[in-house]
């Protein structure tokens, strides 16, 4: 029964994906639209193969992909360390939380894109502002989810652990962290997605290197199938990360 319940949504998702691809192919082939405006899925997947094999007008794909992946991983590492640290600080000290959390909420509400020129002026053009912008987008959700997860632990669990003679480290690692883990992991998953958005957006804003620069190159040169292919390959990075964190969430919930 449980297997059937988990299989049905998967079948529905795949059926929807196939329907979208078929409709997309039909529109691209028979709607009398220029290939410059819309590329068919068959052309896009063929272009992905060409890009991966190096036989395409898109220059230095692997070099630029390595730059983007490196920027994403670096930005995400900083996001996790900084976000978890701030979340721990806010949750462990009411004074720190009351003093600094409202300030962070104000920055969270600001459109981050207006801060990117400041990063360019401070860090110059290159990978550093891209990494910083990725951190800027991802750190808030990691911080708030970490803080919320640590604060939502039932007081009865803490009192029970204290009555059993647990010390502070044991209470944290055996009671608080397992109870907060699902919320924290959800924040880490969302933070990864925001980090990708930040890095790619920064690469598009100031074209230097990375997948964002290739997307810009394909756009200005009307390489529509290459543009679609690059967008799909960029999405694949996010999907892979989301799948990993979804697996971690299922493990922690169990």
Residue map of PLM features:
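Alpha-helical membrane-interface segments at transmembrane helix boundaries
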Residues: 62-74, 97, 104-107, 124, ...
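Transmembrane alpha-helical segments of polytopic membrane transport and secretion proteins
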Residues: 1-18, 243-254
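Hydrophobic alpha-helical transmembrane segments of polytopic membrane proteins
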Residues: 212-249
